[in-house]
Structures are given as structure tokens and as C-alpha cells.
Design a protein with these regions (language model features):
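Outer-membrane beta-barrel biogenesis signature
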Residues: 6-48
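Surface-exposed strand-loop-strand hairpins of Gram-negative outer-membrane beta-barrel proteins
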Residues: 15-21, 38-39, 48-78, 147, ...
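Hydrophobic, lipid-facing positions within transmembrane beta-strands of outer-membrane proteins
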Residues: 28, 43, 75-81, 157-163, ...
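Outer-membrane beta-barrel channels and translocator barrels
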Residues: 40-42, 88-93, 102, 168-172, ...
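Membrane-embedded beta-strand positions of outer-membrane beta-barrel proteins
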Residues: 45-49, 95-97, 163, 175-179, ...
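Transmembrane beta-strands of outer-membrane beta-barrel pores
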Residues: 49-57, 99-105, 158, 167, ...
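Outer membrane beta-barrel transmembrane domains
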Residues: 59, 117-147, 230-344
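Outer-membrane pore/translocation modules
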Residues: 100-238, 286-288
Length: 344
């Protein structure tokens, strides 16, 4: 019992944040999230709030005779509840059930983001040419309309079940296998979910570098179902993701630095129709939908509470920008979050 309590204490204190990659389109699908590879000693309830500001100006796409329109401008505030517990007779396996409510609205975060851009001299992605704190979400093409929102909506999200089994464990760390499943309980028209089933699997590792440092990793492969709308532009069926998390303990405070990288959401073959020059390309959803997405996060955990912030910076060629070795998708542009975890 003492050993189990110690494992729970260490895993809870130095485990990764378990973040998903937010954003209007990515949130519709399953995201295999990181976790400590060591067993879970007791049930726990995790409650979290997060804010994601998305900004992609109107974009027109073409593939042969097909045409598509995208416009993603919102603040999404999410409340997520997750209950996870070890199996009674197989304590090295745990299962979690996760549900989410999201308010899609104009929010308040546009002005602080623009102020930060002015302060740092960063490119403002043509935000100043559009109304602040507005909601406008459109995904449509020659085949149909997936969503078209002009006013705030509260959306019930898809239900997610996650099961993880520790297969190797020793003094320096552990290795675990994971299987996740998403069921379509949310409505696509309200941006609650994709309207289809998704599944994913992954390998997780945890290494104790020192009594005050832990390193976590995740490699995952997922299969996405199609959007429930008859749009021509559908997600790629297969997706990979990589994630790394470094947890550094300073007394009762844990500082976390994380990086997660996801494959492109949408398939190749579509071209953005010209307009707006280089600034128009950078401000559109081209990179968000058709390129790899890399999210960098920093967080602090103390006791049962954790706070974090995330930005997307993806290394790679970007000839349309003055900084040509990195790109930013702005989907989301910025994320803030707060979580409370209660052992049961």
C-alpha cells in the first residue's frame, strides 16, 4: 500500500500535462494525449478549462472543378471532465472516460493578442482588417456545408475512452501501450465533433532522469472517420503524432516544458486560390490544414492545480515570411489552460 501510494504521488506530480492540440478543426477529431507510462495507483477526477483563440482569414481552395471555403475566427472556451481508474484485478491497466463542453464565441482575447504582436514587433496576420472579438466559422465546398456559424454556440463534445497498459516497469521508468476511441456524441453543425468514429493507439515511455526530473514520450497513430457532412474536402484517414514532456521539480512546484507534433489534417491536392500576396497566405488556414502542426507548451503544477500556455511554432521552409525557417498556423493562435486533479 505504501509503494502504491508513492507511485501515485510521483506519477501525479511529475506526469505530463496531457494536452490536446486545440483549434476549430483539430478539436473535431481524436487526439491521443500523453500520460505517465507508470501504473495509476488510484482513481482520479480531472477537471480542466482551456481557451483557444483561432484566427484564419477567409480562404478559397480548389481541386480540379471542386471549390471550398474556410473562415475560422473564434475564441473557444472548453470545460473537460475526465475520470480514470485502474482495473481492479489488473492494476497495471487503467481506463479513462472523457467528455467536453465548448462555447464557441467571439470572446475577449483578440485585443490582448494584437497588443502582444505590437509590443514584440510580430506580424499581426492582418487581424486589424477584421472585426475584433467576432465569431465567424465556415467550412463548405461543392459537396456541402460542414458548419456555418455566425453567433455563439454551446456544443456538447464527442465522448472519448482511453485505455493504457504498463508493459514494462523498472527503477528508471516504464513503457506503456495505449488505445483510444472517440464516439460521435457531438454535432458537427455546432462544432461538437466530427460526426464519425475515430480510434488511435500509441506507445508511451517515462524515464526518471533524476529525483527531480522526468522525461515522457509518446508516439501514436490514429484513424479518423469522415465528417458527417458530404463535403468533398475530408480529413486524411491516417495520422501520426509525437510528443515529448520534461518535468522539473523545484520543491512542491513542477515546471513542465512540452512539444507535440501532428501530421497534416487535410489531404494534399487542394490549392489555395491566389489573393492577398504573402500576407494573405500567412493569414489563411493553408498551413493549419495542410501542413504539420507543432505545438510548444509551458506549464506549472503545484499540488492539485496546473496552469499552462501553448503556441504553435513549426520548423520548416516558409518562403512567404521574413522568417523563412518556421511557420505559424494560428489554429489556434494561443491557448491558456487550468486544471484541477482530485485523487479519489
Amino acid at each position: 500500500m505504501l509503494l502504491a501510494s508513492l507511485i501515485a504521488l510521483l506519477a501525479g506530480a511529475t506526469g505530463p500535462l496531457g494536452l490536446r492540440t486545440q483549434g476549430t478543426l483539430r478539436e473535431l477529431f481524436l487526439d491521443v494525449t500523453a500520460a505517465d507510462a507508470r501504473p495509476l495507483a488510484r482513481p482520479e477526477l480531472d477537471l480542466r478549462w482551456s481557451l483557444a483563440n483561432d484566427w484564419n482569414e477567409p480562404m478559397q481552395l480548389a481541386r480540379h472543378d471542386d471549390r471550398a471555403l474556410q473562415y475560422l475566427d473564434e475564441q473557444a472556451d472548453s470545460l473537460t471532465a475526465s475520470y480514470r481508474a485502474p482495473w481492479p484485478r489488473l492494476p497495471w491497466i487503467w481506463t479513462a472516460v472523457e467528455g467536453r463542453l465548448t462555447e464557441h464565441w467571439g470572446g475577449w482575447s483578440d485585443r490582448p493578442i494584437e497588443a502582444w504582436h505590437r509590443l514584440t514587433g510580430a506580424f499581426n496576420y492582418q487581424r486589424e482588417a477584421f472585426p475584433r472579438d467576432q465569431l465567424r466559422l465556415l467550412y463548405a465546398d461543392s459537396g456541402g456545408v460542414a458548419f456555418d456559424l455566425r453567433s455563439a454556440r454551446l456544443a456538447v463534445g464527442d465522448l472519448v475512452a482511453r485505455t493504457q497498459a504498463t508493459v514494462l516497469q523498472g527503477a528508471p521508468g516504464a513503457v506503456a501501450l495505449r488505445f483510444d476511441l472517440k464516439a460521435p456524441t457531438g454535432l458537427l453543425s455546432r462544432l461538437g465533433g466530427s460526426g464519425g468514429f475515430d480510434l488511435g493507439g500509441g506507445v508511451l515511455g517515462t524515464v526518471l532522469l533524476a529525483p527531480w526530473a522526468a522525461l515522457h514520450g509518446l508516439v501514436a497513430l490514429s484513424h479518423f472517420g469522415e465528417l458527417s457532412a458530404p463535403t468533398r474536402l475530408q480529413p486524411k484517414p491516417w495520422h501520426w503524432s509525437f510528443e515529448g514532456s520534461l518535468a522539473l521539480s523545484f520543491g512542491e512546484t513542477v515546471v513542465l516544458i512540452e512539444d507535440r507534433c501532428l501530421s497534416p489534417l487535410l489531404p494534399p491536392g487542394w490549392q489555395r486560390l491566389p489573393g492577398g500576396g504573402d500576407d494573405g497566405i500567412l493569414s489563411s488556414g493553408l498551413y493549419a490544414g495542410f501542413r504539420v502542426h507543432n505545438q510548444v507548451s509551458a506549464g506549472v503544477r503545484r499540488g492539485r492545480f496546473a496552469v499552462w500556455a501553448s503556441e504553435d511554432f513549426t520548423p520548416g521552409p516558409n518562403p512567404h515570411s521574413t522568417i523563412q525557417w518556421i511557420w505559424v498556423s494560428n489554429a489556434p493562435d494561443f491557448v491558456l489552460g487550468l486544471s484541477f486533479t482530485q485523487p479519489l
